[in-house]
Amino acid sequence: MDGRNEKPTTPVSDFRVGSSEQSQAGVNLEDSSDHRTSNSAESKKGNLSGKSISDLGISNNDNKNVRFTADTDALENDLSSRSTETSDNSKGTDGQDEEDRPARHKRKPKVSFTHLRNNGKDGDDETFIKKIINNLTGNQGGLVPGLAPIPSENENGKNDIEKNNRNEEIPLSDLADASKIVDVHEGDDKEKLEALKLEGDVNCTSDGETLGSSSKNSFLAPAVDHFDDYAENNSSDDNEGFIETSTYVPPPSQVKSGVLGSLLKLYQNEDQNSSSIFSDSQAVTTDDEGISSTAGNKDVPVAKRSRLQNLKGKAKKGRMPRLKKRLKTEAKITVHIADILQRHRFILRMCRALMMYGAPTHRLEEYMVMTSRVLEIDGQFCIFQVV
């Protein structure tokens, strides 16, 4: 009986010891004073944790560090696995980029002006910017004249042309155009050829003036007031900045009459000459009739007959100076028209030169107005920029 009672006691003590040891593994260090109580709920947790740890093959001596070491190892394993995955991914992307680089480089189009110009889609889809690019890259020089690309082979030829142009003399007057204008309005008259023979002061011209002097009051007209004529005292706030007292040229009081006014004078002279010739012809006919009548009468004395013949000769001589005067006025009108045309050509040539070498376009009109005032020409100018 005693042996039977002793046998079950040993496992009970062992159980208590095991429970106490297992409970110590599950209890915090601060509660070490109460670790002998084996009937608490913490002992149950210790038993469960002990079973789970024993199942994993971990001894009871390492129970205190099992929970913490397991967590840190898991974190380190996760971080290492992630780093390896990212490194693998980065290597894969780098390899893919290296493989795709030549292909993408080949597929990338070259964006240039020639690509935009020669794409073969010049239709309604063409935008304003594309038109500007086409004009800038064209062979016509774009918006600025004279900037067309010149091949190297033709540069020497261009230099030769420029040298030849420098050596050429610019004629001060050209009567061909003026004579054509006068011929159109004059008619078929053989005596008009003598109009080109310049007489007296017409032949004597200085270096500073063209054929025809500006001192003749017959070819001057009063200046017309235009909207762009600025008074010298009115250059305050309303005028633009480029109009200054040093560059301002006041309009002249008298200007040279234009081509139309000269042609009107030509017609006026023809009317006066025709009327004078008609009156002279009537006078000559009456004188002829009187001479013929007197010649028929034998009773007329010889002195009276000679006087009538002298009157007939004076009438013929009076007709010749009037014809010379008419030819002289026609010559003056021709020279005046040639002078006006020459000044027009000079203004246009100067405007083209300024546009060619980069003068500001918003000031060209003002420059032309000032030049026309200096040349005593009444002119208005409007510049159209070709885009």
From Swiss-Prot:
Species of origin: Saccharomyces cerevisiae (strain ATCC 204508 / S288c)
Organism taxonomic ancestry: Eukaryota, Fungi, Dikarya, Ascomycota, Saccharomycotina
Miscellaneous remark of the record: Present with 1480 molecules/cell in log phase SD medium.
Superkingdom, natural source: Eukaryota
Record field: compositional bias (Basic and acidic residues): 32-45, 155-169
Annotated spans, Disordered: 1-126, 138-169, 275-298
Similarity section: Belongs to the ThrE exporter (TC 2.A.79) family.
PANTHER family in UniProt: PHEROMONE-REGULATED MEMBRANE PROTEIN 10
Protein name (database record): Uncharacterized protein YJL107C
